[in-house]
Each structure stands twice: as C-alpha cells, then as structure tokens.
C-alpha cells in the first residue's frame, strides 16, 4: 500500500516537471530507419523505448540480428510445442537410467522431469552456440545472414525485391512466433489449452 501511494506521488510530481526537448531527435531517428526492413504498416518504424534514438546504424543492426535470432528460435519452439502436444516423440531414452522420451510430459512439466545434468548440458550447448557458432556475423549481406559456401538454398537466384520481401516475411513470422510461444506458455500456466482436442 505504501508503495502504491509513493508511486502515485512520483507520478503526480513528474506531471509538473519540465519536458525533455527530444522531439527533433526522435523525428530524425524515425526518418533514418523508416526505410529499413521491418518498418511496415500500420506502425512503420516502432521504437517506443528509444533504443536507437541516437541513430546508430551498428546498434540498429545488432538489435535486428537479435530480433531475427529470437524469431527463428520462437518459430522452432512453436513447432516443437505443437509436435509434442500431438504426441509425436523421439524414440529411445533420454538418459541411461531408462527414462524414455515418451514418458516426459509437455511444456514446463518437462523441466522437473529432466535431470539437472541434462539441463546443464542443454544450457552449455546453447552457450556454445552463442559464443562459437551463432556469433554476430558482420560479414554477411544483412544481419542474420548465416549463408556460407555449403548452405545457400538458391538465395542468390532471387532478385533484390524478392529477397527483401522474403526477409520481411521471415521477420514478421518471427514476431508472430514470439507472441505465439508466449501465449502457449501463459495458457499452459493458466491451465487452459489453446490446442483443440
């Protein structure tokens, strides 16, 4: 209760504080990134926290790379969640004690079933990927470009407009997947399934 009163006092005091004069910077920043990938209708360039208010292109590219990475991981997470909910499991055992993949429950309940050593292996593998494999590659054509001489899938056969469109589709699907996996996790905690029976 005391915290709520204190917070309301701070809010009312802030109402009479002089405003910062940053409108010109905000407009200039919006114009700098308005033509970037992801600045699409209806929002256009959307940076409510002012993370790139200084107009730093390198910082913007880093944040775009992180957004793409989280979107790709979220797309895999949504597919994995739906596959598990439909009862499709890997064959065999997850450990040497005979715990089968089929006996592990879905969602958050799986974390209590997997041993601490197993969780540590997963975290170590993700850390290895972050540090060694999926580090921020600046030599690519665009942020998140992990192509090399072995993996290409015909990307260079597309014209520039098609490449831009496909990158925008991936970005939007990644954004939707981030919201989707969060919705699945929240509903699981609430005890309400989003998956029809």
From Swiss-Prot:
GO biological process: photosynthesis
Keyword terms: Chlorophyll, Chloroplast, Chromophore, Light-harvesting polypeptide, Membrane, Photosynthesis, Photosystem II, Plastid, Thylakoid, Transit peptide, Transmembrane, Transmembrane helix
Gene3D superfamilies found in the cross-reference section: Chlorophyll a/b binding protein domain (1.10.3460.10)
One GO term describing the cellular component: photosystem II
Family membership noted in the UniProt record: Belongs to the fucoxanthin chlorophyll protein family.
Localization of this protein: Plastid, Chloroplast thylakoid membrane
Record note on quaternary structure: The LHC complex of chromophytic algae is composed of fucoxanthin, chlorophyll A and C bound non-covalently by fucoxanthin chlorophyll proteins (FCPs). The ratio of the pigments in lhc; fucoxanthin: chlorophyll C: chlorophyll A is (0.6-1): (0.1-0.3): (1).
Transit peptide boundaries: 1-31
Organism: Phaeodactylum tricornutum
Main location: plastid
Molecular function via GO: chlorophyll binding
Any Pfam family hit: Chloroa_b-bind
Protein function: The light-harvesting complex (LHC) functions as a light receptor, it captures and delivers excitation energy to photosystems with which it is closely associated. In chromophytic algae, LHC is associated with photosystem II, energy being transferred from fucoxanthin and chlorophyll C to chlorophyll A and the photosynthetic reaction centers where it is used to synthesize ATP and reducing power.
TM helices/strands, residue ranges: 73-94, 114-134, 174-196
Protein name from the UniProt record: Fucoxanthin-chlorophyll a-c binding protein F, chloroplastic
Lipid bilayer topology: Multi-pass membrane protein
Domain of life: Eukaryota
Entry keyword annotation includes Transit peptide: yes
């Amino acid at each position: 209760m005391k915290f709520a009163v204190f917070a309301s006092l701070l809010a009312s005091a802030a109402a009479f504080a002089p405003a910062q004069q940053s409108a010109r910077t905000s407009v200039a920043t919006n114009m700098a990134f308005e033509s970037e990938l992801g600045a699409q209708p209806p929002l256009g360039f959307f940076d409510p926290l002012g993370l790139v208010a200084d107009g730093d292109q390198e910082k913007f590219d880093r944040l775009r790379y992180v957004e793409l990475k989280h979107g790709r991981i979220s797309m895999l997470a949504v597919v994995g969640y739906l596959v598990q909910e439909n009862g499709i499991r890997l064959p065999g055992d997850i450990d040497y004690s005979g715990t089968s993949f089929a006996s592990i429950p879905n969602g958050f309940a799986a974390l209590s079933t997997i041993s601490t050593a197993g969780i540590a292996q997963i975290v170590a593998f993700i850390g290895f990927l972050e540090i060694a494999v999926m580090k921020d590659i600046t030599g690519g054509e665009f942020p998140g470009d992990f192509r090399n001489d072995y993996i290409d899938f015909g990307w260079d056969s597309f014209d520039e407009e098609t490449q831009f469109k496909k990158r925008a589709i991936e970005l939007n699907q990644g954004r939707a997947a981030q919201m989707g996996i969060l919705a699945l996790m929240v509903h699981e905690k609430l005890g309400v399934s989003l998956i029809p029976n």
